[in-house]
Amino acid sequence: MKTRTQQIEELQKEWTQPRWEGITRPYSAEDVVKLRGSVNPECTLAQLGAAKMWRLLHGESKKGYINSLGALTGGQALQQAKAGIEAVYLSGWQVAADANLAASMYPDQSLYPANSVPAVVERINNTFRRADQIQWSAGIEPGDPRYVDYFLPIVADAEAGFGGVLNAFELMKAMIEAGAAAVHFEDQLASVKKCGHMGGKVLVPTQEAIQKLVAARLAADVTGVPTLLVARTDADAADLITSDCDPYDSEFITGERTSEGFFRTHAGIEQAISRGLAYAPYADLVWCETSTPDLELARRFAQAIHAKYPGKLLAYNCSPSFNWQKNLDDKTIASFQQQLSDMGYKFQFITLAGIHSMWFNMFDLANAYAQGEGMKHYVEKVQQPEFAAAKDGYTFVSHQQEVGTGYFDKVTTIIQGGTSSVTALTGSTEESQF
C-alpha cells in the first residue's frame, strides 16, 4: 500500500504529463489524497475507457474524429461494437424515456433517479464483459481476424448534476465506478433542467457552472481515473439565468426579471462563446448545444474557442431534434461531420439514435404484422435482413450463442468433470437450423 506522501508525489508527477496540458485544478494533490481514504479501489473499465477515448481523440480514430451513436441497452451497444463504432454515447434523454430506475417514462427534465445513468453504464459494460468472455472462451484473442474489441469508451450524460457541487461530485464518482470513460455536465439550473431543444432553459451563473466542473474533476482525481470531462453550454438558446451575482455574466443580463425571480439574458452565440471560454480550462472538451445543424455557427464557436485555447477539443450533438433535410441539402448532410471535424469537433454523436431506431423499427414491424400477412412481414423485415447482414459481421441470427448459451455450456461441462447431458445448445433448434 502506498503511503500518503507517495500518493501525493505520484499525483503531482502525473499532473505534469501532456495529458493534463491546459487543464486548471484549483486544488492540490494533497487535497485529493486527503479525500481518498487508505484504500482506493481501482476502476479498471473506466481507466481503460478513458485511455482509449483519449487516444481516439488524438489520432487513433478511423475517420480522424469519433462519430458515436446513442445507446440505451447493452445489446444496442454490443451491436455498435460489432459494427465498428468507436465509442458509445449514453444520453439522459434516452434514460429518462425508457431506461431509468423508476421504471417509468419521463421527458428530459431530470425527473428520474440520479443513479439511473450510472446503472445503464454498468449494464452496458456488463454486456461488453459477457461478449468478451464468450469470444475468449472460444479461443478468439487479439490478433485473430474474428476478434472484436468490445470495450468501447462510454460517454455518459450527467445532465446539470442533479443538484449542487456535492451532487455533481457524487454523480461523477458513480459514473466512474460504473465504468464511464467520459462524462458531460451542462450549465442549466438542475431543478428546472430541460432538454437542450426545449424552451424554458435557465442558466446558472458562470462561476457556479465552473464549480460543478471542478467538483467533477476532483471526483475523477479522487478515484484515480483520467476521466474525460465535457463542459456543455446551453447559452445559445437559454435566455434566463438564476442570478446577476457573477460579474462575468453582466454583459448579457437585460435587467428584466420573471415572475419566478429569474433574470432575462441575451441568448445567442456570443453568450455561448463567453461561457465556452470560461469552461475551457476546466474541461477536456467543450460543447455548445445548438438549435439547428448550422455549420457557420459551429465555425464561429470553434474559432472563438481556438483563438484563446488553440487545439481545444470540441464536441457536437448531431441531434434527431433537428429536421436535417429541412435545414440542409443531401450533399451538405453527407459532408457535415467531416466539416465539423476540420473545425476541431472531434467527438460527434447522435444522442437519440438508439431509441429512435428501436421505437421506429418496432412500429414498422408491428404495423405490417398487424395489418398484413403475419409471419411474412417478420421474415421480410427482420429475419432475412439479419441473414443478409451476416457478411458484415452481424451474428444475432444465432441469438442463443450471442447471449452466452455456449459459454455457460462450457461452465456446466467444467463443473461436471468434462461431460454433461444437460448442455443447452446441443439439440437446440439453433444448432439444427442455423
Curated annotation (Swiss-Prot):
Biological function: Involved in the metabolic adaptation in response to environmental changes. Catalyzes the reversible formation of succinate and glyoxylate from isocitrate, a key step of the glyoxylate cycle, which operates as an anaplerotic route for replenishing the tricarboxylic acid cycle during growth on fatty acid substrates.
Family stated for the protein in its record: Belongs to the isocitrate lyase/PEP mutase superfamily. Isocitrate lyase family.
Free-text activity regulation comment from the record: Activated by phosphorylation on histidine. Competitively inhibited by 3-phosphosglycerate, oxalate, malate, chloride, phosphate and sulfate ions, and uncompetitively inhibited by succinate and phosphoenolpyruvate (PEP).
Cofactor: binding comment: Divalent metal cations. Can also use Mn(2+) ion.
Binding-site list for substrate: S91, G92, W93, G196, H197, R232, N317, C318, S319, P320, S321, T351
Any one of the GO CC terms: cytosol
Protein's name according to its UniProt entry: Isocitrate lyase
pH dependence per the UniProt record: Optimum pH is 7.3.
InterPro entries found in the cross-reference section: ICL/PEPM, Isocitrate_lyase, Isocitrate_lyase_ph_CS, Pyrv/PenolPyrv_kinase-like_dom, Pyrv_kinase-like_dom_sf
Resulting phenotype, A219C: Isocitrate lyase activity is reduced compared to the wild-type
Top-rank EC class of the record's enzyme: lyase
Record-listed E.C. numbers: 4.1.3.1
An MF annotation (GO) of this entry: isocitrate lyase activity
UniProt-listed Gene3D superfamilies: Phosphoenolpyruvate-binding domains
UniProt binding sites for Mg(2+): D157
Cofactor(s) annotated in UniProt: Mg(2+)
CDD domains in UniProt: ICL_PEPM
Example GO BP: glyoxylate cycle
Organism of derivation: Escherichia coli (strain K12)
Keywords (A to Z) from UniProt: Glyoxylate bypass, Lyase, Magnesium, Manganese, Metal-binding, Phosphoprotein, Tricarboxylic acid cycle
Assembly: Homotetramer.
Active site, renumbered: C195
Pathway, per record: Carbohydrate metabolism; glyoxylate cycle; (S)-malate from isocitrate: step 1/2
Catalytic activity: D-threo-isocitrate = glyoxylate + succinate
